[in-house]
């Protein structure tokens, strides 16, 4: 069928309007540093973001005690991402100073792709804003480390500290302003048998360990407004064949509340809420995640009722590490809508355990044989320790806010200058004392010997030293 005259321009206008609306709704951070470290030219990703080289950028400067080396990856095999084609290698302390236009929480991602043996064996520390992020870190395989940290200065110093005899490196840096709704201040503390409300979460630093899309496909940065990656839950599901377990997929529209500052697509994208796993009143589902022991964790569980046909039909229990964190959870009473996203933040202290488990199970209020509970997604983040470190403490001389705010190179230079000044002052005092002693002793000896001896050598040797006989 032939198209009518003018349909092509009309279609083009409609597409342009749709594209403009989509672009306008996409998250645009105030601070947005995208840096290709060691690169000679820009690196453009499939999601459209453009990373610029770490030299010649007005909003960023690189400081180091000695020259840093831009290193290019070998031609074969080809790097899986344009960000992995080069790296910046540090043989000593170095800092990136990143300008901050809006203070508050920022997302920081550090890309490590060790394309040679030197990088794979490098061992170093990384600090930012007075916090130790990585301690004795080695990237023997490709990895992206993501952090969510509060920034209260106009310049954020991102510092790399190689271990003695080793090097430090980084392939790419992302630092951008986080939306306010991404970080809440209140959570539920699961501490033994006590389930209590806790606050102060907004002042913490978080390291993302897991971001799971339950029963859904992998979500890439191309489909996430904050350029996150969500992986499928299959590898973490303990009892997939639990009674009444079912995977769900939703083709409708997720009902984000208009004008809400709490729930937006920046908290989690549609692709995360469009899938879920459910259990019936007799069953339960458990997910297990290996984590380092001796840390506190934020567990964020996402819920969006895409399984019910009507409101007020679901009641279920939520468990964290075997403890009942929420009893008879009523998602309809909480949100008042179907397909309406919601999340709960739990705080867990793992002193000796190296495994973190979350689970959903049927409630006594559930209808027998009917769908009872569900889960759409889960995020697990490690929280910073009281000493400001994510993974242990820095050596005492390095664990200083001044060091991170001013830069390690400047601190070391200041310390060296102070030591040199003190040494010179001590030498000067010693010389003055010795000179005064010699003036006194040698002056008396010269006067006596010049009268008793006819040898003039002693007088010539000390002829610039006056004595009483010279007046």
Where are these regions (language model features)?
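Compositionally biased, intrinsically disordered or flexible polar/acidic segments
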Residues: 2-471
């Amino acid at each position: 069928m032939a198209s009518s005259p003018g349909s092509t321009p009309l279609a083009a206008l409609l597409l342009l309007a749709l594209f403009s609306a989509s672009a306008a709704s996409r998250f645009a951070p105030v601070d947005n540093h995208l840096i290709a470290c060691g690169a000679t030219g820009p690196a453009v990703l499939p999601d459209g973001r453009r990373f610029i080289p770490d030299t010649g950028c007005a909003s960023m400067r690189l400081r180091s005690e000695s020259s840093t080396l831009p290193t290019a990856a070998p031609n074969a095999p080809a790097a899986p991402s344009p960000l992995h084609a080069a790296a910046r290698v540090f043989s000593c302390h170095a800092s990136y100073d990143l300008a901050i236009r809006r203070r508050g929480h920022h997302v920081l991602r550090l890309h490590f792709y060790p394309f040679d043996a030197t990088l794979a064996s490098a061992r170093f520390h990384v600090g930012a804003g007075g916090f130790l992020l990585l301690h004795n870190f080695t990237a023997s395989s490709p990895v992206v480390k993501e952090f969510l940290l509060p920034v209260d200065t106009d310049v954020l110093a991102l510092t790399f500290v190689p271990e003695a005899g080793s090097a430090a490196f980084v392939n790419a840096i992302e630092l951008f302003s986080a939306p306010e709704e991404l970080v809440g201040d209140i959570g539920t503390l699961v501490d033994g048998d006590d389930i209590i409300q806790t606050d102060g979460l907004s002042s913490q630093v978080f390291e993302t360990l897991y971001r799971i899309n339950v029963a859904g496909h992998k979500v890439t940065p191309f489909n996430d407004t904050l350029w996150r990656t969500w992986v499928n839950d299959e590898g973490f599901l303990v009892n997939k064949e639990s009674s009444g377990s079912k995977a769900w997929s939703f083709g409708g529209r997720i009902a984000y509340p208009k004008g809400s500052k709490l729930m937006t697509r920046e908290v989690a994208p549609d692709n995360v809420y469009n899938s879920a796993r459910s259990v019936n009143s007799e069953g339960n589902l458990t997910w297990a995640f290996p984590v380092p022991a001796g840390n506190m964790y934020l567990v964020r569980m996402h819920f969006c009722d895409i399984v019910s046909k009507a409101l007020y039909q679901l009641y279920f229990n939520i468990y964290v590490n075997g403890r009942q964190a929420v009893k008879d959870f009523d998602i309809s009473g909480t949100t008042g809508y179907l397909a309406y996203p919601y999340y709960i933040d739990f705080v867990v202290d793992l002193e000796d355990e190296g495994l973190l488990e979350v689970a959903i199970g049927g409630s006594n209020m559930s209808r027998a044989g009917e769908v009872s509970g569900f889960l759409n997604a889960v995020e697990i983040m490690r929280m910073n320790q009281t000493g400001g470190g994510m993974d242990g403490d820095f050596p005492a001389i390095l664990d200083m806010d001044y060091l991170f705010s001013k830069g390690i190179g400047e601190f070391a230079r200041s310390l060296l200058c102070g030591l040199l000044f003190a040494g010179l002052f001590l030498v000067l005092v010693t010389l003055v004392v010795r000179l005064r002693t010699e003036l006194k002793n040698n002056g008396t000896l010269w006067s006596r010997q010049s009268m008793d001896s006819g040898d003039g050598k002693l007088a010539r040797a000390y002829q610039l030293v006056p004595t009483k006989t010279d007046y």
